[in-house]
Amino acid sequence: ISAEAPLYAEVGMPALSPTMT
């Protein structure tokens, strides 16, 4: 999910984005 983390962050799910948190 680390690779998809920034994608989730843009979608509106910063909780699933450890790298963007």
Curated annotation (Swiss-Prot):
One of its GO terms (cellular component) is mitochondrial matrix. Coiled coil: none annotated. One of its GO terms (molecular function) is dihydrolipoyllysine-residue acetyltransferase activity. Binds 2 lipoyl cofactors covalently. Its cofactor is (R)-lipoate. Keywords: Acyltransferase, Lipoyl, Mitochondrion, Transferase. It catalyses: N(6)-[(R)-dihydrolipoyl]-L-lysyl-[protein] + acetyl-CoA = N(6)-[(R)-S(8)-acetyldihydrolipoyl]-L-lysyl-[protein] + CoA. Its EC number is 2.3.1.12. It comes from the Eukaryota. Forms a 60-polypeptide structural core. This is 78 kDa dihydrolipoyllysine-residue acetyltransferase component of pyruvate dehydrogenase complex. It comes from Solanum tuberosum (Potato). The lineage of its organism: Eukaryota, Viridiplantae, Streptophyta, Embryophyta, Tracheophyta.
